């Protein structure tokens, strides 16, 4: 009985962690290879896709599938690059997830979680639903031991030469408690 419970707990923790829409649920491809991330992680990197936004489950899932296909087919990544992707519908989509190294920020992938917002946030503000989803994901990440309690949030632009996560999203996360201004 104890072994069955442990197996069930591990399955639930990995596949449905923090209310994330799993790859199976958004019809994602299986990664070609995985490398495990040392946890808990101290750094969270926020990005944007610079694509159109989405507000429905179907539209967001399609964009996530398109990103995964582009990353795997054109960039030769093992999987979608981001750890998580957040839609304007307020849902968080599984990318590399909490357990696997992503391919989102050169030089930082093995020591961070990359969270990407679907849309272009240079001129548009992210939806309140998407911001609430990020807060809930981060809170859950700490509770489940994926993130350190004193984790830091940075914008992609702070680490490489890019406008990501866009001016409006960057200005939003700069006001958050865990933001690291460097």
Curated annotation (Swiss-Prot):
Which first-to-last residue range defines the signal peptide? 1-16
Q: What top-level branch of life does the organism fall under?
A: Eukaryota
Give all residue intervals belonging to the N-acetylmuramoyl-L-alanine amidase domain. Answer: 39-166
**Paired cysteines (S-S):** 18-140, 54-60
- Summary of subunit composition and partner proteins: Monomer.
Which organs or tissues contain this protein? Answer: Strongly expressed in fat body with weak expression observed in hemocyte. No expression detected in gut.
Question: In the UniProt record, does the keyword Disulfide bond occur?
Answer: yes
Family as reported in the entry's similarity comment: Belongs to the N-acetylmuramoyl-L-alanine amidase 2 family.
- The molecule here is called Peptidoglycan recognition protein
Q: Pfam family of this protein, just one?
A: Amidase_2
InterPro entries reported in the protein's UniProt record? Amidase/PGRP_sf, Amidase_domain, Peptidoglycan_recognition, PGRP, PGRP_domain_met/bac
One of the protein's GO biological processes: peptidoglycan catabolic process
Species assigned in the record:
Trichoplusia ni
Keyword terms of this UniProt record: Disulfide bond, Immunity, Innate immunity, Signal
Q: Please explain the role this protein plays, according to its UniProt record.
A: Binds specifically to peptidoglycan and triggers the propenoloxidase cascade which is an important insect innate immune defense mechanism.
Q: A Gene Ontology MF term for this entry?
A: zinc ion binding
Tell what triggers its expression: By bacterial challenge.
Does Disulfide bond appear among the keywords?
Answer: yes
